[in-house]
Amino acid sequence: MLIPFSMKNCFQLLCNCQVPAAGFKKTVKNGLILQSISNDVYQNLAVEDWIHDHMNLEGKPILFFWQNSPSVVIGRHQNPWQECNLNLMREEGIKLARRRSGGGTVYHDMGNINLTFFTTKKKYDRMENLKLIVRALNAVQPQLDVQATKRFDLLLDGQFKISGTASKIGRTTAYHHCTLLCSTDGTFLSSLLKSPYQGIRSNATASIPSLVKNLLEKDPTLTCEVLMNAVATEYAAYHQIDNHIHLINPTDETLFPGINSKAKELQTWEWIYGKTPKFSINTSFHVLYEQSHLEIKVFIDIKNGRIEICNIEAPDHWLPLEIRDKLNSSLIGSKFCPTETTMLTNILLRTCPQDHKLNSKWNILCEKIKGIM
């Protein structure tokens, strides 16, 4: 059963609330099941942060359901250039988010369910949560062969991944979140989670590719709504709480004071890209010049998402050394992103001799450089 989460039926989840108590009026004795009415990845991730930072979960576990419009979510210690096709994401208007938990990269859309299990640090148990999901799936379709693995994934028929896991453990609280593939766009998923960038050297956490499958392909009755209700029922029975899914608005400051600032932080370039572990790119590409292919070599060091070292090598007869040196020096300290590179190269182009052939070569080189960003 869905219940709107409004000021008239708010819940006091803390005995010693660390935020203004205006957002929560009544006391929850055993636990709570929430569902976001938002499909914005940043707003929903902010709910996780808020609950983790502000709620006393002693004896009051929380299950949080949320779904996002098409988005790619990378782990806390991952490199987006290594994990996904950023150029395709920009073309398609797909959001990129970096979560605060570890783990690998996932694709979200409205055919995917996200589940977050909040507990105290002492009660944190990923395997128990996954077993709960398996029981819920078997309750609605006993013929399903779903098993939890040692890597805390859920496999369908022993080979198809339908759920991936990540977690965050704080000083006193913890959460485990996972996906559940119902009717996700598999073609889009595989295209977006395939990096086209070559020559990346990084110590960032790398995702492990897996075969995936939607539950709806196995049984067309297994819709997102059916699955969420099944998991909620099993969760309520396990924790002996009311089987009610309470709808929340993750932008409501009366319920979650300060939550919008958390969502804004998650959208910043400094968080999404700037938190990428230091990496380098050592690659090359070819350009056509007078019916022959010339090789352009590129070596770039990136730290905190900004170019620290830049060395672009091209034949002198194709592009003068002086111009290449200007390009190398101008990019140092800039964001490793096509928008800022476009701005810098346009400014630099104005200082170059107004020569049609030279400008054409310059544009070709700059487009190639932006293509690896």
UniProtKB/Swiss-Prot annotation:
Membrane-spanning segments: none
Annotated GO CC locations: cytoplasm; mitochondrial matrix; mitochondrion
Enzyme Commission code(s) on record: 2.3.1.200, 2.3.1.-
Main location: mitochondrion
Official protein name in the record: Lipoyl amidotransferase LIPT1, mitochondrial
Role of this protein: Lipoyl amidotransferase that catalyzes the transfer of lipoyl moieties from lipoyl-protein H of the glycine cleavage system (lipoyl-GCSH) to E2 subunits of the pyruvate dehydrogenase complex (PDCE2). Unable to catalyze the transfer of octanoyl from octanoyl-GCSH to PDCE2. In vitro, it is also able to catalyze the transfer of the lipoyl group from lipoyl-AMP to the specific lysine residue of lipoyl domains of lipoate-dependent enzymes but this reaction may not be physiologically relevant.
Residue positions binding (R)-lipoyl-5'-AMP: Y107, R151, K161, T179
Pathway annotation: Protein modification; protein lipoylation via exogenous pathway; protein N(6)-(lipoyl)lysine from lipoate: step 2/2
EC supergroup of this enzyme: transferase
Ranges where the BPL/LPL catalytic domain occurs: 57-243
Cellular compartment(s): Mitochondrion
One Pfam family named in its UniProt record: LplA-B_cat
Disease link: Lipoyltransferase 1 deficiency: An autosomal recessive disorder due to a defect in lipoic acid metabolism, resulting in severe lactic acidosis and metabolic decompensation. Variable clinical manifestations include delayed psychomotor development, severe hypotonia, dystonia, loss of head control, coma, bradycardia, and pulmonary hypertension.
Residue span of the annotated presequence: 1-25
Tissue: Highly expressed in skeletal muscle and heart, moderately in kidney and pancreas, and detected at lower levels in liver, brain, placenta and lung.
Organism from which the protein derives: Homo sapiens (Human)
Any GO BP: protein modification process
